[in-house]
C-alpha cells in the first residue's frame, strides 16, 4: 500500500505541481485511512470496496471527525483511488458515488472596520513586531491565503507599484494589488529584515533566519490579536474573509473579488454575498420602522 502512495506523492509533486501544504494534508488523511484499514486486516488497495469506504467514513466519524474533515478525508481517498485506476491497478474507483455527510452551512467570520483599526493600531519599533505588522497589513490588504503569504520571496513583492505575485492553489500564479499602508509596513520590515540573518530569499523569516512556518504565523497572529484586545480569535482565515467582505461591500463586484481571492469557481466567492446580505438584514432590522423588534 505504501509503495502506491509514494508513487502518488511523486505524481502530485512533479506532474500536478501541488503545493507541499496540500500534499501534507492529503498524506495526513490517507495515513489515517491506512490505520483504519489495518485494523480490519486490509493491506491491499484491491480489497477496498464501496462498503469499506463507507466503513472508513463511519469509523472516522466515530473518532470525532466533523463533517468538513470527513469530506476532506473522502476527497483525498477518492482522488488517490482514481490515480490507481489511471495506473491500471484498480478496475473501478470504489469511492465513486459515495457522499460524505452533509456539511452544515457556516458563514465565515470577519472583522468590521473598527476592529481592523484596533488590530493595526500598534507602532512598536521592535523588529519582530515590525515583521508581524507587515504580515497583518499584507494579508488584510490583499486577502492572501496563509500558504500564499508564507511562500512569498523578496522578488514576489513590488512596493513601487504595490503589487504582489502569489502562487495559489493548483500552482496558479496571480498578481494582487495592495494598499499604501501595507506598502509602508513592508518597506519598514525590509529595513530590519537583515537583523534576522536570513538564510534564503523568503520575504518573511523567523528569528532563526529561516522562512517563517505556517504554524508560526498562526501563533503570532493569535498573540497579536490578544495583545490588541480583540474579543475574538484572530487567524489568517479571518483576515482573508474580512478582506473579501469589505471589498464586496464597497464594490459589489463579485467577479473582481473572485479574481483577487484566486477562486477558480465563482460559487466559492458567492458565500460572501450571503455574508453581506446578513449584515444588511441586521441593519434593516435595527433601522426600519416596520422591522424594529418590540422590547
Swiss-Prot record:
Residues 1-85 form the Core-binding (CB) domain. Residues 106-285 form the Tyr recombinase domain. GO terms for cellular component: cytoplasm. SUPFAM superfamilies: DNA breaking-rejoining enzymes (SSF56349), lambda integrase-like, N-terminal domain (SSF47823). Gene3D superfamilies: 1.10.150.130, Intergrase catalytic core. The active site is at 145, 169, 237, 240, 263, 272 (o-(3'-phospho-dna)-tyrosine intermediate). It comes from the Bacteria. It is found in: Cytoplasm. Transmembrane segments: none annotated. Keywords: Cell cycle, Cell division, Chromosome partition, Cytoplasm, DNA integration, DNA recombination, DNA-binding. One of its GO terms (biological process) is cell division. One of its GO terms (molecular function) is DNA binding. Site-specific tyrosine recombinase, which acts by catalyzing the cutting and rejoining of the recombining DNA molecules. The XerC-XerD complex is essential to convert dimers of the bacterial chromosome into monomers to permit their segregation at cell division. It also contributes to the segregational stability of plasmids. Belongs to the 'phage' integrase family. XerC subfamily. HAMAP family: Recomb_XerC_XerD. Forms a cyclic heterotetrameric complex composed of two molecules of XerC and two molecules of XerD. This is Tyrosine recombinase XerC. It comes from Haemophilus influenzae (strain 86-028NP). The gene is xerC.
Amino acid at each position: 500500500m505504501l509503495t502506491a502512495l509514494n508513487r502518488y506523492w511523486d505524481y502530485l509533486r512533479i506532474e500536478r505541481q501541488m503545493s507541499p501544504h496540500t500534499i501534507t494534508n492529503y498524506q495526513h488523511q490517507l495515513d489515517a485511512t491506512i490505520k483504519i484499514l489495518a485494523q480490519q486486516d486490509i493491506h491491499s488497495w484491491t480489497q477496498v470496496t464501496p462498503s469499506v469506504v463507507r466503513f472508513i467514513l463511519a469509523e472516522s466519524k466515530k473518532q470525532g471527525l466533523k463533517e468538513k474533515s470527513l469530506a476532506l478525508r473522502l476527497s483525498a481517498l477518492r482522488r488517490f483511488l482514481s490515480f490507481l485506476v489511471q495506473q491500471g491497478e484498480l478496475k473501478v474507483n470504489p469511492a465513486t458515488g459515495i457522499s460524505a455527510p452533509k456539511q452544515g452551512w457556516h458563514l465565515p467570520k470577519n472583522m468590521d472596520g473598527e476592529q481592523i483599526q484596533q488590530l493595526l493600531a500598534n507602532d512598536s519599533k521592535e523588529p519582530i513586531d515590525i515583521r508581524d505588522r507587515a504580515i497583518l497589513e499584507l494579508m488584510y490588504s490583499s486577502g492572501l491565503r496563509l500558504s500564499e503569504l508564507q511562500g512569498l520571496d523578496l522578488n514576489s513583492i513590488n512596493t513601487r507599484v504595490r503589487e504582489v505575485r502569489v502562487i495559489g492553489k493548483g500552482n496558479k500564479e496571480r498578481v494582487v494589488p495592495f494598499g499604501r499602508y501595507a506598502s509602508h509596513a513592508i518597506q519598514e520590515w525590509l529595513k530590519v529584515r537583515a537583523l534576522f540573518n536570513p538564510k534564503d530569499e523568503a520575504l518573511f523569516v523567523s528569528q532563526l533566519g529561516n522562512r517563517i512556518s505556517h504554524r508560526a504565523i498562526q501563533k503570532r497572529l493569535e498573540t497579536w490579536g490578544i495583545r490588541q484586545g480583540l474579543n475574538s480569535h484572530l487567524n489568517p482565515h479571518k483576515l482573508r474573509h474580512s478582506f473579501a467582505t469589505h471589498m464586496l461591500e464597497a464594490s459589489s463586484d463579485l467577479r473582481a473579488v473572485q479574481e483577487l481571492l484566486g477562486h477558480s469557481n465563482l460559487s466559492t466567492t458567492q458565500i460572501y454575498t450571503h455574508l453581506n446580505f446578513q449584515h444588511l438584514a441586521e441593519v434593516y432590522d435595527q433601522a426600519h420602522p416596520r422591522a424594529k423588534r418590540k422590547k
